[in-house]
Amino acid sequence: MGRSPCCDKNGVKKGPWTAEEDQKLIDYIRFHGPGNWRTLPKNAGLHRCGKSCRLRWTNYLRPDIKRGRFSFEEEETIIQLHSVMGNKWSAIAARLPGRTDNEIKNHWNTHIRKRLVRSGIDPVTHSPRLDLLDLSSLLSALFNQPNFSAVATHASSLLNPDVLRLASLLLPLQNPNPVYPSNLDQNLQTPNTSSESSQPQAETSTVPTNYETSSLEPMNARLDDVGLADVLPPLSESFDLDSLMSTPMSSPRQNSIEAETNSSTFFDFGIPEDFILDDFMF
């Protein structure tokens, strides 16, 4: 069996450290060095376990601890070391002077991991992944670039058109007012226009113009043979223009009077004198 943890011993204090305990630990390590962490609490006059003293010194009391934000070079080093070592924060902190393992772990979970996810990289395997929401954010950043027109021209040949089309549909949901060239949808179409253009188009049948003229020629010939005298009846020799002008034209008013007169005489009938009405009475 292994050794029992030092924290399980009776009389060991737990909980937050006080300023007096911090000063005792700093003074002892400054004069004697850390030495053996299991015997340090007793020698320093602390009612703490060795592990608690080590973590307190390593993460908070060391004079060479670097405070503040992580630089870009430090983040890139953490990403490279994490791709090889995984979640071994103590080993990663040993290669970053001034940074503690606890601080590196917190910065990884709160900043670096989210940045990798937004960039389309799996934070566990460090391999690219095609997550739809992450891909739409990538395309959103790509649309804002000034040289996007040249990239969009060759987008269909570089990436899968189906994925790009789906991402272009998801982009307006995330950004209500997207700014990107209008010819993006044309560039993201599947390359099937060449096959469609290669299909022969149906030729529309047109009637030749000489057919119409040839069909009208016999009719024109027949009209030429028929004279005006054959169509109009001959005028009488006594016909004179003066007689035509002297004949009064019937007005619509006269025509209506004549129609009323004819209708009144149409219903006139006479009763014979020898008609006896009693013969028809019952």
From Swiss-Prot:
GO biological process, one term: regulation of primary metabolic process
Domain (HTH myb-type): residue spans on this chain: 9-65, 66-116
Molecular function terms, GO-annotated: DNA-binding transcription factor activity; transcription cis-regulatory region binding
Key words of the record: DNA-binding, Nucleus, Phosphoprotein, Repeat, Stress response, Transcription, Transcription regulation
Subcellular location: Nucleus
One GO cellular component, as annotated: nucleus
Gene3D superfamilies: Homeodomain-like
Region called Disordered, residue ranges: 180-213
Keyword Glycosyltransferase part of the UniProt annotation: no
Post-translational modification: Phosphorylated at Ser-251 by MPK6 in response to salt stress. Phosphorylation is required for its function in salt stress tolerance.
Main location: nucleus
InterPro entries linked to this entry: Homeodomain-like_sf, Myb_dom, Myb_TF_plants, SANT/Myb
DNA-binding region ranges: 37-61, 89-112
Record-listed Phosphoserine modification sites: 251
Induction behaviour: Induced by salt stress. Induced by osmotic stress. Induced by abscisic acid.
Superkingdom field: Eukaryota
Biased composition annotated in UniProt, kind: Polar residues: 183-213
Complex formation: Interacts with MPK6.
UniProt xrefs under PANTHER family: F14D16.11-RELATED (PTHR47994:SF5)
Task performed by this protein: Transcription factor involved in salt stress response. Confers tolerance to salt stress. Involved in distinct cellular processes in response to osmotic stress, including control of primary metabolism and negative regulation of short-term transcriptional responses to osmotic stress. Can activate the steps necessary for aliphatic suberin synthesis and deposition of cell wall-associated suberin-like lamellae. Involved in the production of aliphatic suberin under abiotic stress conditions.
Name under which the protein is recorded: Transcription factor MYB41
Gene behind this protein: MYB41
